[in-house]
Amino acid sequence: MPETSEHTSGSRELTEGSAGPVGEVAAGPATAREATGRIPAPVLAVAAMFTVQLGVAWSTSLFEPLGVAGATSLRLLVAAAVLLVIARPSLAGRTPRQLATVALLGLASGGMTLLFAASIQRIPMGVTSTIEFLGPLGVALASSRRLSHAGWAALAGLGVVLLCLADDGLNGADGLDTVGLALAGAAALCWAVYIVFTRRVGQVFDGFQGLAVSISVAAVAVLPVGGASAWHGLVDSDRTLWLLAQGVGVALLFPVATYMLEMTALRRLSSRVFGVLTSLEPGVAVLIGFLVLGQSLAPVQLAGLGCVVLASIAATLGDRGEE
């Protein structure tokens, strides 16, 4: 696959030879392969999108008792522990450059996770997800040599403008919270950085190993910001076990289940098909935000979301045509 098209899909793993945030589409545990082997690959890809958004929506229930940073820290710590047990990565023989690359991927992952969580506390989840999606879309468009992609970039920009045209924000606020929008934009930048290092890490770590290491770095990076909040929230609560159970459940949904589903789907789908499917993720975010959190978008905002999704699909199809 040409270098110019590897980042087009906008998913957490953007190449046919990659999976999760770490690149390799290596086989996961045998039990996971057996459990998903008979499920159509497109269903797995769509299921992965739902696990992301359901996990994010569920995590909002932890914001009040643990704080946004605390809830994020707990989720990443649990996910890192689970993935380390599954992958059992070894750092022996890695060069300083390889370790720095996976560390940067982990920092981008931690930043993206924390910023996204902070954003959805202030603006609807569908808006945050759509703005964040500009990160991978921007990488795809920037790496393309096709003149038509300038038009898709303009369409995506129009979509963001339409998304911001809201009369009401969360909790009765007048319009969308500007800090929330800025946080979503910062999350998009983190996702773009995260994508750049995806393939590099996948070239030196097999299977789930790179994922386990990068998520562990993310957990350590967020710990100084959210560790104390999570600890005090758990210790001071009379529902400590329930909060811990929720944290485990959220982490198992995203990132653990998400990446396993995506890795399996990518082993059986072309990157072109996978890219088109994952371009629908902002729409899934709007649906989950409505069903789980009771959030709705104005018609003009839905039109903006449609512009971003259309730009992503068009960029994906255009790039695959260059292969």
Please annotate each region the language model reported.
Residues 1-70, 104-107, 111-115, 158, ...:
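Glycine-/small-residue-enriched transmembrane alpha-helix faces in small-molecule transporters
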Residues 2-6, 12, 16, 20, ...:
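C-terminal-most transmembrane helix of multi-pass membrane proteins
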Residues 62, 71, 75, 119, ...:
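Hydrophobic/aromatic residues within transmembrane alpha-helices
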Residues 46-58, 86, 103-118, 161-162, ...:
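Hydrophobic alpha-helical transmembrane segments of multi-pass membrane transport proteins
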Residues 70-78, 117-147, 187, 271-290:
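Specific alpha-helical transmembrane segments that line the substrate/conduction pathway
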Residues 40-44, 70-85, 149-158, 179-186, ...:
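Hydrophobic alpha-helical transmembrane segments of multi-pass integral membrane proteins
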Residues 74, 105, 131, 151, ...:
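Hydrophobic core positions of alpha-helical segments in small-molecule transporters
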Residues 83, 134, 148-169, 288-290, ...:
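Hydrophobic transmembrane alpha-helices of multi-pass small-molecule transport proteins
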